[in-house]
Amino acid sequence: MRILIFGINYSPELTGIGKYTGEMGAWFAAQGHDVAVVTAKPYYPEWKIHQAYKGTGWTTEKIAGVTVYRVPLYVPKRVTAKKRILHEFSFLAGVSPKWFGLLLKKRYDIVINITPPFHLGFFAASYAKLRGAKLITHIQDLQVDAAKELGMINNKKALDLLFKAEKYLLDKSHAVSSISLGMKKKILAKGVPESKYVMFPNWVDEDVIKPLTREDSLRNEWGIPMEDRVVLYSGNLGEKQGLEIIINAAERFRDRPNVHFIICGSGGARDRLKDMADRAGLRQVQFYPLQPYEKLPALLATADVHLVLQKKSASDLVMPSKLTGILAAGGCAIVSAVPGTSLHDIMYMHQLGILIEPESAEALATGLQQALNEDLTPFRERARQYAERFLSKDQLLKEFERHLVKLTTYEKQT
């Protein structure tokens, strides 16, 4: 098949949507498909264009057999709701000339639109209509719902317009996929028939991310004694994620210097969180940059306890991608989730970690006390078993490929 992917994030971004889209593109190319991607300069999660891509306009490169068309965009130094809108629309403006160029090239069989941003779908839908391709919309985050529930957009007319635009794009899609059951319910409630829906969860390469010993972790590199306890948060440090509770909870462990809080990543809240820890005199709270993929197994093995923290308003609109790696590494996570959401249900049903109330430093401190004072081996064993059974990269991508083949009635050569 010839597959064209539209998405604002792609490799070499190490985390978030770009990681998964990049791995998907590379996997399809490895199966012999002709794959191209229209994407932005890499900028996430640092919100800073990577050095190797600075000062360039529209470029083309090959990554793991995939033709990658990069377009310029505006990346704000400080992310606000208004600046994020400008950021996304600047990307759409950059896509326009490349879109026209693609219309003149050999037709693609499948167009995959990765959302957010959801309005990128207008380019994908238009291409599919004009060239007779099949369109699949893959939803990593219900962006308009999130903007409403997080209070980022409060104007009713604007929200109505956005929901109508979203419905139009969903109606034009030949298939719609998402990453969790909670998102599926919301998507079906928008009028998408179940026959068009495809479950396509985020995955993990369980052959790469696997349990390691403490001796194989980053403890020696970071000067952390093997007998000490480590609480790890790794990922995007966004302003709206409520990560202050990590610092607040760490204050409860001030008199336990053998308990280390490691915050690994970048984002708009990093400097503020570091300032909070410094002002509180919390020397056991340490900050490190996001680690490269090849160090991820060692990073995950460093922790006794992992933190997966979400705000209440996130509910089932997003599914934390960091959890897949934690489970594959056989890690025990403290997860903040609202009862009834997919995240809560999965964690509870399979007993994969410790569930706490979101946005509560008290609940986090209590969960940490529990985690640091009991044998976590059963949690770790169940986590790895779950990853092997439900999150296998090869298994999930093969299943998704089968859906694409059905859409195009393409007989894959074996």
Residue ranges and their predicted role:
Residues 51-58, 210-224, 380:
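A short helix/loop element that forms part of the nucleotide-sugar donor recognition site in Leloir-type
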Residues 100, 119-122, 126-130, 157-176:
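Membrane-proximal helix-turn-helix segments that form the acceptor-binding/catalytic region
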Residues 241, 289-298, 306-327, 333-345:
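Nucleotide-sugar-dependent
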